[in-house]
Amino acid sequence: FGVNTGFAVWDSKQRSLLQVCSLPIHKAMERVRSLYDEYKAGIGDKVIVRVEDPRQRTWFGTERMSREMERKKLQGVGSVKRDASIWDDYLKELGVEYEMVAPKRNVTKLTQERFKALTGWQKQTNEHGRDGAMLVYGF
């Protein structure tokens, strides 16, 4: 859980997704830096990063779980919260424009079929990639 992070690039001029994937957090950070470097050099478009921030969520759906299941779920939540903190610090230091987004305001956990129908994205995706794409889709 939490090994890979969803990553997507939305082109607001073309109104289309350019990339949807899942990759380790350090690789996602390298891609953000690369896109931002291109923008600063005058060869790329403006970059706005949106990060899902579970620190803004107040419930985690553990009410009907056993103690063991709840413990595992909350460990995963802790790891995702830590990732959000890391992103927050990294993006602030990088100087790129960004927004931390509360999970409830984002459409997540779409099936591959539903995602294709909604976005028109035809390539293979996983849940992480689709969740990342829904953070930027239509933005």
Q: What function would you assign to each model-found segment?
A:
Residues F1-F139:
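Phosphate- and other anionic-substrate recognition elements at nucleic-acid/protein interfaces
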